[in-house]
Amino acid sequence: MAKFANYLMLFLLVASLVMLEAQSSDTIKAPDWGKRLLMNHDSDLGAIPCGESCVWIPCISTVIGCSCSNKVCYR
């Protein structure tokens, strides 16, 4: 279980760093729809995105209170 928690934390760290790099860099162009969906805190759902999708598998971040809505995990 400890290995799973370590891998989960590593995954969340890498995912957040990739999103920060995509947001700040001019050379990396994230699709507007995906960028708005994952990084917009003023979304129409009124929720904070957890930074993962739930298209094929459920939200891994349900342990911190996230749930799936419109194929993106929100808290």
Curated annotation (Swiss-Prot):
Q: Which UniProt keywords are given for this protein, alphabetically ordered? A: Antibiotic, Antimicrobial, Cytolysis, Disulfide bond, Hemolysis, Knottin, Plant defense, Signal
- Which SUPFAM superfamilies does UniProt cross-reference here? Cyclotides (SSF57038)
Q: In the UniProt record, does the keyword Signal occur?
A: yes
- Tissue expression: Expressed in fruit, pedicel, root and stem but not in leaf (at protein level).
* Disulphide bridges: 50-66, 54-68, 59-73
Its source organism is Chassalia chartacea
Q: Which domain of life is it from?
A: Eukaryota
According to the UniProt entry, the note on domains is: The presence of a 'disulfide through disulfide knot' structurally defines this protein as a knottin.
What task does this protein carry out? Answer: Probably participates in a plant defense mechanism. Active against E.coli ATTC25922 but not against S.aureus ATCC 12600 or S.epidermidis ATCC 14990. Has cytotoxic and hemolytic activity.
What's a GO biological-process term for it? defense response to Gram-negative bacterium
Does the record's keyword annotation contain Signal?
A: yes
Q: What is the lineage of its organism?
A: Eukaryota, Viridiplantae, Streptophyta, Embryophyta, Tracheophyta
- What is the similarity comment for this entry? Belongs to the cyclotide family. Bracelet subfamily.
Q: Where is the signal peptide?
A: 1-24
Annotated InterPro entries: Cyclotide, Cyclotide_bracelet_CS, Cyclotide_sf
Task: Enumerate the propeptide ranges.
Answer: 25-45
What protein name does the entry list?
Answer: Chassatide C8
Per its UniProt record, what PROSITE patterns does this chain match? CYCLOTIDE (PS51052), CYCLOTIDE_BRACELET (PS60008)
